[in-house]
């Protein structure tokens, strides 16, 4: 009787493990779904880490109580290798070679002036000045909140070329500060009340390079929504509430992803068209407001390399407020560039985002 009960229990647990893997796979490849057609299904990527962790707990259980069963979660990770690596990559440590340029993308939360000050004592301004980056792309960067008489000359000395866009409108303010000449710039047009993307054409060591700075549509989750998501992830919410709140969260997420998808498509089309017509390389960065398991990420990954996936390590959470930890800030590059040592720098906490950094080396013979 005891053996039968044990066998039955192990089969039930094995079945639950298989079900977890199936859900993990479905969510992991949900980025292939066009949000315009199925917005709810395309929004479930936010829940991917939950099933990633559940499968890990199954692995621990099997190792402790029936080691042969460990094959189930291990096979699960193998078949879900692509989304798992996209979400939490691991790479050999790489040292940026001589001649590599350093790119920094940072949603600066309008420089968090309440906590950081308005002058050179502002922690975010100080971080940028001491970053050593060659190209700095900022989102939510309303410069007028700073003491520009004090800050502007110092920024100009470190970064002689810059463009600040959107400071005098209701839209987000995007900025670029760079050591390279800016040949021209233009806005990539798409529908949005406040978000935007800008294309800059830089002269990097005699070659024209397209740099695109993005701040795509926000998910518009309030503090209560974020607290509930945190409770779902931590498992402190009862099952009935989990179902109810998950549906409500998915409703908000699906509304945002439906707006965001055509924005990403416009940017992807712009980059592809420009590269074909002008034969130039591209660097794309910004706050995507989407996780690595998303249509936005999948669309831009079709013709570009995610620098963090290619050279970073760990989940690289770039948003870190209100109990939500997700990687929504990105740096991508075209095939002419090789990324090195991408990282999300969690040492500066003034903004609700951490900056993402990567070194890029121009390849002499791209594939």
Please provide the spans of the model-predicted regions.
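Surface-exposed, flexible loop/turn segments at secondary-structure boundaries
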Residues: 111, 144, 219, 290, ...
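Active-site beta-strand/loop signature of hydrolases that rely on acidic residues for catalysis
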Residues: 102-108, 120, 124-148, 165, ...
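Acidic/histidine-rich helix-loop elements
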Residues: 105-121, 143, 220-256
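N-terminal, active-site-proximal structural segment of metallo-dependent hydrolase catalytic domains
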Residues: 1-154, 166-171, 264-268, 362-367
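Active-site/binding-pocket entry motifs
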Residues: 109-111, 183, 217-218, 306, ...
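Structured beta-strand-rich core segments of catalytic domains in phosphoester-bond hydrolases
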Residues: 27, 73, 77-98, 115-116, ...
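Metal-dependent phosphoester-hydrolase catalytic domains
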Residues: 9-64, 71-75, 186-188, 261-283, ...
């Amino acid at each position: 009787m005891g053996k039968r009960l044990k066998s039955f229990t192990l089969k039930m647990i094995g079945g639950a493990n298989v079900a977890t893997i199936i859900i993990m796979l479905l969510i992991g490849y949900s980025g292939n779904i066009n949000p315009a057609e199925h917005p709810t299904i395309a929004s479930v990527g936010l829940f991917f880490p939950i099933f990633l962790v559940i499968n890990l707990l199954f692995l621990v259980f099997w190792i402790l109580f029936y080691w042969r069963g460990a094959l189930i979660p291990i096979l699960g990770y193998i078949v879900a290798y692509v989304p798992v690596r996209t979400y939490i990559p691991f790479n050999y440590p790489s040292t940026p070679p001589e001649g590599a340029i350093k790119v920094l993308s940072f949603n600066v939360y309008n420089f968090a002036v309440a906590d950081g000050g308005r002058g050179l004592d502002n922690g975010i301004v100080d971080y940028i000045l001491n970053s050593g980056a060659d190209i700095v792309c900022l989102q939510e960067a309303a410069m007028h909140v700073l003491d520009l008489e004090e800050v502007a000359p110092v920024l100009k000395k470190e970064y002689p070329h810059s463009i600040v866009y959107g400071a005098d409108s209701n839209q987000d303010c995007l900025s670029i500060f760079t050591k390279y000449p800016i040949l021209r710039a233009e806005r990539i047009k798409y529908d949005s009340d406040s978000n935007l993307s800008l294309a800059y054409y830089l002269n990097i060591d005699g070659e024209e390079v397209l740099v695109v700075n993005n701040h795509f549509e926000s998910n518009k989750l309030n503090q209560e929504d974020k607290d509930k998501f945190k409770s779902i992830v931590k498992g402190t919410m009862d099952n009935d509430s989990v179902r109810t709140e998950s549906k409500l969260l998915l409703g908000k997420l699906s509304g945002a992803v439906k707006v965001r998808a055509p924005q990403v498509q416009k940017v992807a089309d712009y980059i592809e068209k420009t590269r074909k017509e002008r034969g130039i390389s591209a660097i794309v960065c910004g706050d995507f407001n989407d996780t690595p398991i998303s249509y936005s990420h999948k669309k831009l990954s079709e013709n570009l390399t995610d620098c963090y996936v290619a050279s970073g390590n760990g989940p690289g959470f770039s948003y870190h407020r209100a109990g939500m930890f997700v990687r929504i800030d990105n740096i991508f590059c075209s095939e002419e560039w090789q990324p090195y040592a991408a990282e999300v720098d969690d040492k500066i906490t003034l903004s609700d985002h951490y900056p993402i950094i990567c070194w890029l080396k121009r390849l002499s013979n791209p594939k």
